[in-house]
From Swiss-Prot:
It is an enzyme of class 4 (lyase). Its EC number is 4.2.1.11. This is Enolase. GO terms for molecular function: magnesium ion binding; phosphopyruvate hydratase activity. Keywords: Cytoplasm, Glycolysis, Lyase, Magnesium, Metal-binding, Secreted. Belongs to the enolase family. GO terms for biological process: glycolytic process. GO terms for cellular component: cell surface; extracellular region; phosphopyruvate hydratase complex. SMART domains: Enolase_C, Enolase_N. The lineage of its organism: Bacteria, Pseudomonadati, Pseudomonadota, Gammaproteobacteria, Thiotrichales. Mg(2+) binds at residues 244, 287, 314.
Length: 456
């Protein structure tokens, strides 16, 4: 039977914050079916593809997405019906050209992405392949090392913590399932530690982490490391720390305003702030350590810490190949966060990952703070062998859904599932270390290629 697109239909559903989002169904002539739901961010980069919302305050406080849904059911459906779902590049190119804008503001990135992902899922169903294997069909796959957001602050929580995410990284294990077990044990132990120290854990943040008021940002790290030890693990051996300060959120008039500590820091002082932490704690990754507009500062940050820790650009690069290219040229950061809805199509996401891999940058596949039960990013992380994933804490079913999908994939792959551990975090070393870099070529559709570099 034919793999041509027969039907495209969108609806408005709710995300994990109770806000409207777009869900799309695609049916092929063969009867194969694909569905995808689109996530949404809280702290968003200024150069992200545009998420189209209606702005009618009488409906969902202005956050409804009926126009995006209408765009899928009319303009986009008419444009892609009859196209071959196995040709992902053509599907995405058709929608990009139909939109005609640089940031997908006319049709909405949420409309376009929903169709892009649902089509890919339908194509996988047509070929009777698991989604990750449809994206890349090889013998062995890298299971991603999870960054688990156990303390939430900033825009993700209603507390006094300036920095947005304090994450545990269970990299000192042989399998993903062992790492996940460690993460859950540390997460539950952290609750006991926070309560014992007099902090409230009555609620959790958008991504499922605890959201206590703390005397300082550093207190979050201290509490986490205490929990790691009390759970029976060794910091720097079994469990490491990753940070996402989301610095654009507290960057005001050229200064970094840490209100919880009553500090107003220059770029150089902010870099020194991080450098002291890197020397003191087992930190392996810092995401958005400086503001997205502070490119000169990013250059200084990379020069000072780029050979010691992974420096991830999220708001900085917004999964955009053209912006990433500028960063690579200027020697800024050494890693990129991959968020599908920042760029709006699967094809462009692959292009960004390919560019990053060819430049020696790592890729971290990521969720958004406004998530759904959709598990596509779990399959994407495995398919591209990115080696890293951010999908929240060990609570809230929208986060757990991704971890459970990774457990299923690891079980299915058996001995062909490789957990890279600390080797997933690639950055230059002061020591002369011989590195073996494996290039995995991912064939997507007829022409798409993703190159992912993995240190062995």
């Amino acid at each position: 039977m034919s793999s041509q697109i027969k039907q495209v239909f969108a609806r408005q559903i709710l995300d994990s914050r109770g806000n409207p989002t777009v869900e799309v169904d695609v049916v092929l002539e063969s009867g194969a079916f694909g569905r995808a739901a689109v996530p949404s961010g809280a702290s968003t980069g200024i150069r992200e593809a545009l998420e189209l919302r209606d702005g009618n305050k009488a409906l969902f406080i202005g956050k409804s997405v009926y126009k995006a849904v209408e765009n899928v059911n009319t303009k986009i459906a008419q444009a892609v019906k009859g196209l071959d779902a196995l040709d992902q590049r053509l599907i995405d190119k058709t929608m990009i050209e139909l939109d005609g804008s640089e940031n997908k503001k006319n049709l909405g990135a949420n409309a376009i992405l929903g169709v892009s992902l649902a089509t890919a899922r339908a194509a996988a169903s047509h070929l009777r392949k698991p989604f990750y294997r449809y994206l890349m069909d090889v013998k062995e796959y890298l299971m991603p090392v999870p960054m688990m957001n156990v303390i939430n602050g900033g825009s993700h929580a209603d507390n006094n913590v300036d920095m947005q995410e304090f994450m545990i990284v269970p990299a000192g294990f042989d399998t993903f399932s062992e790492a996940l077990r460690c993460g859950t044990e540390v997460f539950h132990t952290l609750k006991k530690v926070l309560i014992a120290d007099g902090y409230s854990v009555a609620g959790v943040g958008d991504e499922g982490g605890y959201a206590p008021d703390l005397p300082s940002n550093e207190a979050a790290i201290e509490a986490i490391l205490k929990a790691v030890k009390e759970a029976g693990y060794e910091p720097g051996k079994h469990v490491f720390i990753a940070l996402d300060p989301a610095s654009s959120e507290f960057y005001k008039d050229g200064k970094y305003e840490l209100k919880s500590e009553n500090k107003s820091l220059t770029t150089e002082e902010m870099i020194d702030y991080y450098a002291a932490w890197v020397e003191k704690y087992p930190i392996v990754s810092i995401e958005d350590g400086l503001a997205e507009e502070d490119w000169a500062g990013w250059k200084l940050l990379t020069e000072k810490l780029g050979n010691k820790v992974q420096l991830v650009g999220d708001d900085l690069f917004v999964t955009n190949p053209s912006i990433l290219a500028k960063g690579i040229e200027k020697g800024i950061a050494n890693s990129i966060l991959i968020k599908l809805n920042q760029i709006g199509t699967l094809t462009e996401t692959f292009e960004a990952m390919a560019m990053a891999g060819q430049a020696g940058y790592t890729c971290v596949v990521s969720h958004r703070s406004g998530e759904t039960s959709d598990t596509i990013i779990a399959d994407l992380a495995v398919a591209t062998c990115s080696g890293q994933i951010k999908t929240g804490s060990l609570s809230r079913s929208d986060r757990i859904a991704k971890y459970n999908q990774l457990l299923r994939i690891e079980e299915e792959l058996g001995e062909n599932a490789i957990y890279p551990g600390i080797k997933a975090f690639v950055f230059n070393s002061d020591e002369e270390v011989e590195e073996v870099v494996q290039e995995i070529i991912v064939e997507d559709s007829e022409a798409e290629k993703v190159v992912v570099q993995v240190e062995e």
